[in-house]
Amino acid sequence: MSHHPMRLTIVGCSGSYPGPESAASCYLLEAEEAGRTWRILLDLGNGALGQLHRHTDPLGIDAVFLSHLHADHCLDLCGYYVMRKYHPTGAQPQIPVWGPSGTAERMARAYDLPVDPGMTEEFAFHAYGDNGGVVELGPFRVEARRVVHPVAAYALRVTAGGRTLVYSGDTGPCRELDEVAVGADLLLAEASFRSGDDNPPELHMTGADCGRTASHAGAGRLVLTHVPPWHDPADAEAEARAEWSGPVELARAGATYDI
């Protein structure tokens, strides 16, 4: 860890499904408190657990925060359940998993487990309120804010040591994201759609939408993520740059940011 209050590692950033260069969505955040490094995950999409081994011991994660329950954001919790339950060093202590209401049942179904106990011995499942809520864990303060998507979905505002990362999760452009993103040092925003395509409303954002959100928020920098393998990420970057003059870059697997 550096002297920076919070470090972000892009474990996976491919939109909608794993691509040839990256697993699906997963972001590792690390911060120091009381003489140790705390580690949380924002999402754990398909393919991400394998890549997580490259960056840290997966058994050392303190909590998982899920933005929503689509497969590309939550499904590797199944493998993580196996790892924590059956690891040769013994069953691991239960850790909290925060997500929308119904997360425990969704993950039990995904693994074809009886809902009781499901994964509740390995993970202490907690639900955000309908509109969101605030969680404090070690050095981290995590604020969840309901955004617009076909399922219950949340943007996550994470603060540690006076520095702030805002992760859009999956969302269309909305007032709620604009509000929760205000003052973000780093805005990690999804750019699944291309401007000019026939894009359904309240589903995903374009690079231009991300640029406008960053501008409205007065963000320190914008990192574009969740571009699906069928699009060219350079298009999203160009769109964002046309809307916002601040620093823009494309998320790539393995990249780290000191915030």
Annotate each predicted stretch with a short phrase.
Residues 173-258:
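Cap/insert and terminal regions of metallo-dependent hydrolase folds
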